[in-house]
């Protein structure tokens, strides 16, 4: 499991870094870049990678969340990522459903952290993050926040989702291996 976690972390860093490097800046949606790949093998490879990341890292998180009675949050996060990964195979072009699943995966992954952290600090982080993501995707804020995000809330959600899923999985693995 630790090997799978390290491979998932490396692939997430490489994928996000390659997306930012290829576009010379933050793309509107990192996972939406899969739609510029040729149909067939490249899209299947991306789908398999996202499935490996979600299934390989979220299963220990769900086990740990089950101890707190919040396993449905981890399961919903995993479902969002699995369906988001499969969409480029079945859809010919970028759709809003893909963005919605990406944002849902990002928010649900933060809810996993809030459940694992316990106490008020984890939930405070989640409720501070929610308006930021919604403002960056729906409202188009003005001022410095608008210039910074420029409607790139999907990118913010995806990066948070990758980092959080991998981070919470490492926390879950560390917690389970520390228990006798």
What are the language-model segments listed below?
Residues 118-180:
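Terminal transmembrane helical module of multi-pass membrane proteins
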Residues 1-62:
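N-terminal topogenic module of multi-pass integral membrane proteins
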Residues 10-17, 48-58, 107-117, 132-134, ...:
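Hydrophobic cores of alpha-helical transmembrane segments in multi-pass inner/ER membrane proteins
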Residues 14-24, 82-89, 133-139:
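Transmembrane alpha-helical segments that form the membrane-embedded catalytic/substrate-channel core
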Residues 38-39, 62-70, 91-97, 119-121, ...:
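Membrane-interface helix-boundary motifs at transmembrane edges
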Residues 4-12, 46-53, 70-80, 105, ...:
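Hydrophobic alpha-helical transmembrane segments of polytopic
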Residues 1-5, 58-72, 111-125, 174-180:
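Helix-coil boundary and interhelical linker segments in multi-pass alpha-helical membrane proteins
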Residues 71-130:
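Membrane-proximal helix-loop-helix units in multi-pass membrane proteins
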